[in-house]
Each structure stands twice: as C-alpha cells, then as structure tokens.
C-alpha cells in the first residue's frame, strides 16, 4: 500500500473562532521549517483578512472597511519564508463577513478588485507568489454565490496591472473552495481550478 503524501496546507491566520495574531516571525519561521521537513511545498493563505482583521497593511481595507493595520506584515513574511523554503504561495482574498453573506456579491467583488490590484502591486514580484485563492465558501444555502465566484474570476481574467489573465474554468466540488492556479507562470497565464 502506497502512502498518500500531504504536499499542501492552509495558513489560517485570520480565523472566525481561533485566537490569532499571536505568532511572530520566530514562530512562523519554525512552522515553515517543520512543513518543509514533512514535504509541504504549497501553502494557501485562507484569507488575507476577515472583517477588521488583516494579514498585511492594506490601505484599501483600512480606509474603506475601517480594518486594523496589523503589527506585522504576514504576507511579506509568508512570501519570504516560502522563498527560503522553496514553497509556492497562494493568496486568499478578503472576506468582508458581511457583503457576500448578505447576498451583496457586487460589493464583495468591487472590494476584492481593489485588494487584488493592491496586493499585486505590493507582492506580485515575489517568485513564491503563484496564484489566488477565493475564500468565500459555496454551499447549497448561499443562493447566487456562483455570481461572486464568476465575477471575481472574470475580474482576474481581465488582468490586473496589465500583467496577467485567467482561463476561467469552474469545477464544482460540493461545499469546497475554488482557487485560481497558474498554468504557466512564465507567460502570466492562470487557470481557475481547485488547489489540491
């Protein structure tokens, strides 16, 4: 019987019910070392922010959502640790915790468009930055949530910073998340599909 390898994991720094923001550079560095030792080569930031909590100093979200500026730029740290440990990094978009959950998908898309542009400007240069993760969950009770997924995918399909495009192909997987995955980093061409 062959062993099933675990090659990827989520970084759930901003959480609904788990204490967060209690790790610094030392703790995250040790965690990445352990992940590399066990064969992890892909990490997905489950969300860059949730309501007022952020993983990076977003001017957009501080201004528009009254979010708190974090004491440490975790996105920068995660990218640095990914580069050091030869890991791929996937960026989870912002979860307002209010627009999309109340059916206002247009506002969630509008806000994430600004986040995407800001993040690409700040971190798109990193060799570890490999793609995007759409953190809003799809399930049978979410109504037209597919509009959010399609809208955000189309937004990325048009490109941001004039540097990339997305081949939008949806794969429904029950109540699981979707991600935008690069098919060809060299040509900045992305494919929209599940992460793992």
Predicted regions mapped to residue ranges:
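Active-site-adjacent "subsite" loops/lids of carbohydrate-active enzymes
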Residues: 19, 72, 76-83, 88-92, ...
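Mature N-terminal, pre-catalytic/accessory segment of carbohydrate-active enzymes
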Residues: 1-45, 126
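Aromatic-lined substrate-binding rim segments of carbohydrate-active enzymes
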Residues: 25-37, 41-96, 145-165
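Short, acidic/polar
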Residues: 20-36, 110-122, 176-192
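Flexible loop/turn segments at secondary-structure boundaries
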Residues: 52, 141, 173-174
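Short, well-ordered coil/turn segments that N-cap beta-strands
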Residues: 2-7, 39-42, 83-89, 125-130, ...
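Aromatic-lined carbohydrate-recognition surfaces of secreted/lumenal glycan-active proteins
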Residues: 10, 88-110, 131-137, 149-182, ...
């Amino acid at each position: 019987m062959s062993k099933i390898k675990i090659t990827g994991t989520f970084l759930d720094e901003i959480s609904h019910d788990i204490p967060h923001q209690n790790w610094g550079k030392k703790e995250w560095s040790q965690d990445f070392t352990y992940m590399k030792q066990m064969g992890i080569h892909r990490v997905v930031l489950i969300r860059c922010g949730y309501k007022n909590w952020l993983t990076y100093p977003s001017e957009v979200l501080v201004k528009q959502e009254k979010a708190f500026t974090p004491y440490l730029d975790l996105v920068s740290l995660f990218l640095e640790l990914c580069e050091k440990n030869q890991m791929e990094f996937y960026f989870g978009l912002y979860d307002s915790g209010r627009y999309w959950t109340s059916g206002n998908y247009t506002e969630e898309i509008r806000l994430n468009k600004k986040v995407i542009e800001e993040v690409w400007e700040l971190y798109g240069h990193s060799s570890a930055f490999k793609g995007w993760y759409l953190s809003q969950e799809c399930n049978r009770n979410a109504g037209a949530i597919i509009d959010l997924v399609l809208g955000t995918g189309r937004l990325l399909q048009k490109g941001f910073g004039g540097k990339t495009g997305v081949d939008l192909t949806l794969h429904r997987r029950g109540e699981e998340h979707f991600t935008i995955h690069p098919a060809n980093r060299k040509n900045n061409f992305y494919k929209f599909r599940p992460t793992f």
